[in-house]
């Protein structure tokens, strides 16, 4: 098998595992706060909102930093850092005894997140130009499959073996993804020389559809708010 194809197929497994691990938390997080002593539905929703929002807020803030590191050091190291970091965070979640501890761990999880975005750039750079669309399409399907199956199986796992044991199991799964990435994913990375930072005006000149991209980002932001706002409250409802 060609090296780039092996990288694509292994990436599909890793992306599915990490997407599953991230999304499975949605239906059980409010119930976990209840186990930690949060009793009223309003308080459960509040703590769940804090824990959920904390992760994605930090992701938004640190994503440019990790992107810069990936440009300097390569994408594979980002995959390894993210998968093992999220694995450790899930393991730590299983041993929390206070709501504040859960929120802190979720903040840390936001710091180490970024597996899927790094995989996109890795596959785009490693795949032949004529097969890039095919590879990225498969990657998006794996990410979507993990995101859809995660809440379904997450609730079942928590009901079967308990919430804390579910966190441990998911942590092991993410660690497995990191192990696969470490051993089997290959990257032909060549460090790029330092380039001049572009101002917004110069960036607009180089990107013909700059305004359309900005509009798309705003629309995606609004869409994410609409979707994610339901996660902390749907289980309580």
Regions found by a protein language model. Give the residues of each.
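Juxtamembrane intracellular "pre-TM" segments in multi-pass secondary transporters
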Residues: 1-4, 186-218
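Residue-level signature of mid-helix packing/kink "hotspots" within the transmembrane helices
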Residues: 56-64, 114, 147-148
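Symmetry-related core transmembrane helices of the 12-TM Major Facilitator Superfamily/SLC fold
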Residues: 166-183
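Hydrophobic core of transmembrane alpha-helices in multi-pass small-molecule transporters
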Residues: 16, 89, 100-114, 221
């Amino acid at each position: 098998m060609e090296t780039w194809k092996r990288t694509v197929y292994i990436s599909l497994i890793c992306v599915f595992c990490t997407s599953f691990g991230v999304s499975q938390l949605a239906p059980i997080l409010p119930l976990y706060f209840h186990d930690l002593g949060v009793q009223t539905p309003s308080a459960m929703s509040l703590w769940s909102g804090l824990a959920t929002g904390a992760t994605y807020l930090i992701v938004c803030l640190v994503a440019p930093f990790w992107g810069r590191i990936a440009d300097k050091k390569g994408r594979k190291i980002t995959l390894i850092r993210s998968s093992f970091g999220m694995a450790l965070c899930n393991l730590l979640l299983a041993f929390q005894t206070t709501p504040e501890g859960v929120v802190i761990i979720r903040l840390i999880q936001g710091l180490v997140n970024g597996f899927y975005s790094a995989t996109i750039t890795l596959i785009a750079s490693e795949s032949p130009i004529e097969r890039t669309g095919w590879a990225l399409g498969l990657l998006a399907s794996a990410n979507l499959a993990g995101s859809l199956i995660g809440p379904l199986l997450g609730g079942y796992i928590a009901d079967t073996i308990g919430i804390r044991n579910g966190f441990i199991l998911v942590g092991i799964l993410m660690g497995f993804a990191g192990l696969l990435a470490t051993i089997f994913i290959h990257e032909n990375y060549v460090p790029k020389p330092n380039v001049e930072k572009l101002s917004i005006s110069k960036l607009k000149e180089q990107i013909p559809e700059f305004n359309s991209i900005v509009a798309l980002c705003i629309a995606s932001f609004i869409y994410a708010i609409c979707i994610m706002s339901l996660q902390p409250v749907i289980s309580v409802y």
